[in-house]
């Protein structure tokens, strides 16, 4: 990427060493977007906070803890699938592929994919895209563990990072979207997101996506309301972030975590419940938020899918299904698709 394109896209380049660099949008753009989005999403009757704002440094750390909880099945089931792919995924790839991940690369799942790449590539070019600053920390640790790894991080939203990457080079990509984050989108958002993926993919690119499957309601609700209260802390942390970054005065003791599985819409719904009538100042959004007792702020939904829905979803955008892998209990799926 030349300096002119980088400047036009409003990104700044940081070079940490010969194998690690990252790009980040100018901070004023991010702050403006955060303040505007919070104002827009809370200044309405049906209040919500976009779940992408969960993942500051503390939020990302809390989510890593959630992933190790016994109730939270998605991570361990997806890992079990990835272990099966150690000899299978490489059949669809060659040594000209570079790796793009939507996420920080902090988990064992990233390492399982990198292990596959090391079997047929001496030099691995890896592009993690994450809105959280944890990206640089996780990248530094990966460099210590993988000698042939070269990392170019993009600290931005997934959509922003993908559009930036489209102009970066002409090499083939395997794009990863692991975990069950796709389920956080509404159907309209999900379709638009997949269209974005499709539009930035080159003809020979591949896309590997993790999707959570429909299962027993009790299993689902336990996964999002754990006995140790880590999910509660994770949910409340988004208010702490608004306090810190937008100069707000949320009192976290005035809110509780609430989640439920909506069978009709096949999704977990997660909320912050106001425990009293209260007012909150959000200075950088120039906004006074008034909440009634028991009023809900929607913070996340996590859709669950049947396999036929997954295929219809991906085919509807234009993807060609290459293969789907499941865990032993059919709790989770990984589907590999191509553009052509």
Residue ranges and their predicted role:
Residues 2-52, 60:
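N-terminal auxiliary segments of SAM/dcSAM-dependent transferases
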Residues 46-91:
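Class I SAM-dependent methyltransferase Rossmann-like catalytic core
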Residues 96-105:
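Conserved class I S-adenosyl-L-methionine
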Residues 106-121:
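Conserved SAM-binding loop of SAM-dependent methyltransferases across substrates and taxa
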Residues 184-196:
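A short, conserved alpha-helix within the catalytic core of class I
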Residues 199-214:
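Conserved beta-strand signature within the Rossmann-like core of class I S-adenosyl-L-methionine
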Residues 221-303, 307, 311-317:
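Substrate-binding/catalytic lobe of Class I Rossmann-like enzymes that use SAM or dcSAM, i.e.
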Residues 272-275, 326-340:
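Core SAM-dependent methyltransferase catalytic element
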